[in-house]
């Protein structure tokens, strides 16, 4: 049986992923997205930058021939080379499975070498019995660093160091460091004195091997048992961890086919484990469960039990439900996203001699910016809108013009909310969203690695004249960020009392950041900030919807809205903008603006739907 450091890393993130990496059909893997490839390049670049002042040697061997790699590495260690980059360490009988030599090409990655092609010789361990007495461990630390001390080589030994793009010393990285140390000890016949991680911003970070080694052995043993017994783990969809995984499509299809509870917002792995002990394993059972019973368990604190049961009821009925006061989806939904943390979840992807390693734990960047922070009190939402007392009136549906630059279908919309009613909505009824003659819908596109917010998109909806106009303030380079900030502010003051609707709190945080960065006078930005209304916050506080996630795309698509570019999402826009800076291809900017406009329109659709929904449930 062949166990590599990359397989062990996959196992820590998802047992099923590790199982499929070894026993699955590689032909079913999803092709890598542009964003995944970008993250891989970023990780490789970071490693190169970290090593630019280092003097090192690297073993050379045919791609995928780990036995040759181990021999070349051992030769460098015997010579006493100070730094060895991407060495190969092997413990156990190499390449033996039931007495027959097994190729290792492709064994430790999901789908493709760094440059994108599929492995030439896929390995299917499921076709063989895997005796636990015949285990080969393969470790490939980023650096082997020479230290004083006795080993079989002489009066020197080696320690390991891994270079991660992450800002944090995650436990999974520390476990891999302990794995490296264990295999290294068998090679040099002495336990390394230390193991290190090099992290972005934190720099060098020492792993506590006394703490992590026992944990590593427990995880390693569980992984070996799973593969040895070919015990396929149960599917579980976790949007934070699954979105960039190459097995996502087949796993999601399996989950959908059985209506797995992990598809419900709020059903985390720990909560699902508790539900299984209560024999609640399907949507119908959860919909009929007692929230009072669930609330007795620590996995369901406060109102989470009631919310989860309601969520199941909404899915079972395939219709939205009114959320009771004091309850909020943001209190129990964990499939949230964060633009600033994407690179924290990049695995090591610089090994040019093997299939590219997968990226795990990445938050879903396709709908950017869901966070829990409360931005302001509910009462502030309605304080600036006056509703005239005239007859009820409905607006026509939005008609979008398809640009000639795309052949994709135009965005579609649901029925807009009425601007007026037979009686005005009292200010005290905070359950209602503002309905104003002119409304602004705002969305930002950003490049996190450059700390650049390069596009402010605003849809101006004039309900009195039944018109809509989109404004895209685009910075074609970082130098133009300040200029588009001023242009955006000028538009906000063109409509000095219009509410500004956005989805999630990224826009608010960025608005504050830019005001500070460009020394904007308080009188120009603080009154504008008070006009912001977070539609995500309103939806999650007021409604239970039959969606997999309370991100913008699942909600808007459930309402019938479609983005014109099926491929487009926030992560793809990061790639497009990065490519624009390199190539100057203006079609990339047009695609970004088109996507941003559709995000604004989707926010408009969700806001109008929610307004109508709340009006319908008015007491």
Predicted regions and their residues:
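C-terminal extensions
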Residues: 248-265, 269-278, 282-476, 481, ...
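Acidic, Mg2+-coordinating catalytic module of metal-dependent nucleases/exonucleases
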Residues: 198-201, 207-258, 272, 283, ...
